Amino acid sequence: MDFLLLGLCLYWLLRRPSGVVLCLLGACFQMLPAAPSGCPQLCRCEGRLLYCEALNPTEAPHNLSGLLGLSLRYNSLSELRAGQFTGLMQLTWLYLDHNHICSVQGDAFQKLRRVKELTLSSNQITQLPNTTFRPMPNLRSVDLSYNKLQALAPDLFHGLRKLTTLHMRANAIQFVPVRIFQDCRSLKFLDIGYNQLKSLARNSFAGLFKLTELHLEHNDLVKVNFAHFPRLISLHSLCLRRNKVAIVVSSLDWVWNLKKMDLSGNEIEYMEPHVFETVPHLQSLQLDSNRLTYIEPRILNSWKSLTSITLAGNLWDCGRNVCALASWLSNFQGRYDGNLQCASPEYAQGEDVLDAVYAFHLCEDGAEPTSGHLLSAVTNRSDLGPPASSATTLADGGEGQHDGTFEPATVALPGGEHAENAVQIHKVVTGTMALIFSFLIVVLVLYVSWKCFPASLRQLRQCFVTQRRKQKQKQTMHQMAAMSAQEYYVDYKPNHIEGALVIINEYGSCTCHQQPARECEV
């Protein structure tokens, strides 16, 4: 057909000038892709996009040339055979997730050169041949998550130079082959989380110069060596949460631009002092829920760019080794979790680290004070927010110069007892001044009253004098009454001597003489 059209074009060009137009129109029609022959029953068609979802077909539809997109989600496909999609040469995306696919042959995606997005997630795939993705060099996104992959073929991703996103989450992968991503020069996002990785090879991620985000969380890694991530110059986020990491080391001296690192939920007990010097631009660090008891001063000095850190849930030893961390926290101006509790010794268990440092005077040393404002940081910091920032005086034991580093020796609290004495003196002075001020106010009121209302003052004074006299008279009368009652009850001696009778009243006594009685005879 092509040769016939070419012959007609040449004939018309030679015979008539109008043949040029016809030739061009024919070439244009030849370049247009063929339209699909028809929409399969029970499927949904949107132009050149076909959706055959949740229909339970056992194989892919045929004779659908010209399709740009095909979705076969939520079906019962169990196998992808060689050449199964041969007639779909115009296809740009293919969704095969949520099926029962357990076997994929090496030539299953033959002639799908234009496919940019392939989704195979939520199936039962156990392995993929080396040649699986070879017919699709234009792939940008591949999703293999939630399958049963146990191993990756060494050349599985060979030739995928345009791949930018790769998902392999929630499989059973135990090892990442060396240089498996060597050709993935455009890869920016890689997720291998929720697998069974126990170790990493030094060159497992070689060639990923544009990688910005790497997920390795929920694996079985027991050691993290920053040398396993060489020359990842564009990496900004590294997630290693919920592994079994016990130590963090760096056996390769090089600098990378990492800005966010998540090491939470591990079993970290030791970190090399120089390990964070290779990431000078680190801004966010999660170290919560580990087994750290203290942090080396050299590590603290390397955290110069941090704006957020989590340290809760560790086994902090609130002895002398915690002083460097307490001093660093008191001067940290970023965000950190405030729930740092002491795990030892016994007398400090359950106490907040900074509160324990202040309450138990753990870091007092008058010789080399390294933080003059730790007291204010402890008393003024919020529970969940960052501590109060203040100017800090740093002492260098070697040369006596201030270079902005924390020495491992001690953290002094020079304001401890002196601050308490100053507070007491301040209270005494304030109370004395208040009394003097009150006395002066009373004197001022009396003076103003004496000047403005002299008659009222004289009447008031007379009332005071009169009231005082009445009180004295009442006191005298009560005393006399008490004396009379005492004589009546105490000195009275009953006798039958006829004589004078004494009558006592309130104002004095009267004497009455009684004459003896006489008997008369009748």
From Swiss-Prot:
Keyword Transmembrane: yes
Alphabetic keyword roster: Cell membrane, Glycoprotein, Leucine-rich repeat, Membrane, Postsynaptic cell membrane, Repeat, Signal, Synapse, Transmembrane, Transmembrane helix
Topology versus the membrane: Single-pass type I membrane protein
Signal peptide residue numbers: 1-34
Any one GO molecular function term: signaling receptor activity
Segments in the Extracellular topological domain: 35-427
LRR repeats: 64-87, 89-111, 112-135, 137-159, 161-183, 184-207, 209-231, 233-255, 256-278, 279-302
Keyword Membrane listed: yes
Name listed for the protein in its UniProt record: Leucine-rich repeat transmembrane neuronal protein 1
Gene Ontology process terms (BP): inflammatory response; toll-like receptor signaling pathway
Location of region: Disordered: 382-401
Gene: LRRTM1
Record's function text: Exhibits strong synaptogenic activity, restricted to excitatory presynaptic differentiation, acting at both pre- and postsynaptic level.
